[in-house]
């Protein structure tokens, strides 16, 4: 259960001292509603099917074991098919059954004989696990959308295995500095332009070109920093030089990959080439701390460290525990996203924001990827990687499948 006031003070929680079933029983006994555990005014005194657990045939009548929403498993009951008005759940039950049978037959789908009177315990157990997984993923999806501060929606999908939400991941929208690191989030100066597209603006003050064209697409080469208008600028929110700060505009889906790469991210809408897609955020730590954590991550076979080496190599972004959708974006040696360094309110060149832009048109349903070796400088040479404190460790085999695959993530 979330601790009181946790939302206001940041992402933290404590373990629940009792089971979900016990909480539901207590709520019903005291006539209390609690949406987070499924107790609502609608089902406080009524019964609503949450999912179907099992199946049997008795005297030629079909029965399903029903889990009632907001009620503990001890109240599950067998109900005749004719009494069930939940076609979607019935279809889901059937799909899960066939998926399980396909898996045990190594991909060869089979149709169970009509004279089967009961389900095998292993099938029923799998169906219940899938139902509980869907509920957990839906709750996680709802939480992600409550925490995000951008326009694009976040969806979660797993049709591959029984993996549920990550147990130790907290969604954030901006950098989270580690103790001892200070982030300046207020610019010292801003422009007074009436039209930032044509007038000398923040990029010119920094000695670089305006990063975007009139279609909000990036026009500068990789390695060139982006300087957007900031909180001290006189221009409004429709300024053509305010793109990254508006956040992700596209609806994205965190999905389970089928080739052993864990979670991935795909777009649900078409993304034009050279468009801003998302920021890479996480905990900002020192490079020394990154080296220490990196040894631990290597043993687990994960890679979430991103060196902020635009001008120096003092800091690293660690998205292992704290991050946004970018935490789940997979590596590819032939990616469709490109890294750029961005400066908005914090102009400290040691601490650029990391933005990911599309390198080409990305169609709806296509997975988003970026090159884990690519930096905001545009450099992907092996020399720059070997000398990076966050990368100078055990090499991880790459599974991107690209024709140009280098064989390793780092």
Swiss-Prot record:
SMART domains: CHROMO, PostSET, PreSET, SET. Zn(2+) 3 binds at residues 196, 229, 235, 239. Residues 189-247 form the Pre-SET domain. S-adenosyl-L-methionine binds at residues 261-263, 304, 330-331. Its EC number is 2.1.1.355. Residues 394-410 form the Post-SET domain. GO terms for cellular component: chromatin; chromosome, centromeric region; nucleus. One of its GO terms (biological process) is negative regulation of DNA-templated transcription. The keyword Metal-binding applies. Keywords: Biological rhythms, Cell cycle, Centromere, Chromatin regulator, Chromosome, Differentiation, Metal-binding, Methyltransferase, Nucleus, Phosphoprotein, Repressor, S-adenosyl-L-methionine, Transcription, Transcription regulation, Transferase, Ubl conjugation, Zinc. Ubiquitinated by the DCX(DCAF13) E3 ubiquitin ligase complex, leading to its degradation. Although the SET domain contains the active site of enzymatic activity, both pre-SET and post-SET domains are required for methyltransferase activity. The SET domain also participates in stable binding to heterochromatin. In the pre-SET domain, Cys residues bind 3 zinc ions that are arranged in a triangular cluster; some of these Cys residues contribute to the binding of two zinc ions within the cluster. Belongs to the class V-like SAM-binding methyltransferase superfamily. Histone-lysine methyltransferase family. Suvar3-9 subfamily. This is Histone-lysine N-methyltransferase SUV39H2. It comes from Macaca fascicularis (Crab-eating macaque). The lineage of its organism: Eukaryota, Metazoa, Chordata, Craniata, Vertebrata. The gene is SUV39H2.
